[in-house]
Curated annotation (Swiss-Prot):
Catalytic reactions on record: (S)-malate + NAD(+) = oxaloacetate + NADH + H(+)
Name recorded for this polypeptide: Malate dehydrogenase
Entry-linked Gene3D superfamilies: Lactate dehydrogenase/glycoside hydrolase, family 4, C-terminal, NAD(P)-binding Rossmann-like Domain
GO MF terms, alphabetically ordered: L-lactate dehydrogenase activity; L-malate dehydrogenase (NAD+) activity
Binding of NAD(+), residues: 9-14, 33, 95, 118-120
Record InterPro entries: L-lactate/malate_DH, Lactate/malate_DH_C, Lactate/malate_DH_N, Lactate_DH/Glyco_Ohase_4_C, Malate_DH_type3, NAD(P)-bd_dom_sf
Organism of this sequence: Thermomicrobium roseum (strain ATCC 27502 / DSM 5159 / P-2)
Enzyme Commission number, as recorded: 1.1.1.37
SUPFAM superfamilies, per database record: LDH C-terminal domain-like, NAD(P)-binding Rossmann-fold domains
Active site per UniProt: 175
Protein family according to the UniProt entry: Belongs to the LDH/MDH superfamily. MDH type 3 family.
Protein function: Catalyzes the reversible oxidation of malate to oxaloacetate.
GO biological process: lactate metabolic process; tricarboxylic acid cycle
Amino acid sequence: MRRKVSIIGAGAVGATTAQYLAARNIADLVLVDIVENLPQGKALDLLEAGPVLGYDCQIVGSNSYDATAGSDVIVITSGSPRKPGMSRDDLLRVNMNIVRSVTEQAAPLSPDAVIIVVTNPLDAMCHVALEASGFPPARVVGQAGVLDAARFRAFVALELGVSPRDVHAMVLGGHGDTMVPLPRYTTVSGIPITQLIPADRIQAIVERTRDGGGEIVRLLGTSAFYAPAASVAEMVEAVLLDANRVLAASTYLTGQYGIHDLYVGVPIRLGAGGVKEIIEVELTDEERAALHRSANAVRELVQAMKQLT
């Protein structure tokens, strides 16, 4: 029996995620959106690309959550996109209500699913999905670190003129301005970038990574979608194939890194059933302090949500 992935939100990120997953041919796909005909049209367009691109998964679009029943993975992309001058935090009031509604409708129909949250502000929205679903924390995870690390890797590769496939990076913390890229754990074929790039250039790359989403917004007038969708597809594949991938993701911490009861980006082992292990890496005092500052920013958002409900 083929696996099933439901993507809630057929906008740019959701539809592109469906495109990338279809190309991998590892699951049947359902696109759901409140806009009439939008998910149906995009699903049909993707289905018709199958004979050319060589995939044969079923792809359907619907305005009803009933179509998602029995999903192995639910991807939540629904929400208001960032607009020029808008921080992720500005999205809080609008998107918390959207994510709560989506989760309350989708989760009961797929009680064994893994939920991957994409909606911003990401770490705060993971809390909403966790509470609304009633799922264990291991089965509610946020896509952030894969994207942030991908941006870091891309910028390092550009700096050195090497293939990004040879660059491996680690980014911790909340998905936003307070994220914590770790140059010490970033390597090119095993060589730390601290041995390859001057400190001032590393800092510039770190700052560009932190502003990665904002840079796209300023250029496009809306949020990125190719790289976020590719990052989601990688996480979905890890779950469906039980790949035990070591990836950074927004994960519910219960004391790891000295952080309690909070979603923050850290390295995890991701496979069937969601988060199999939270990996604690050794941090310097400065890195740990930066991670805690990032976590505090997330906690402030969570507290703000409580005031809004």
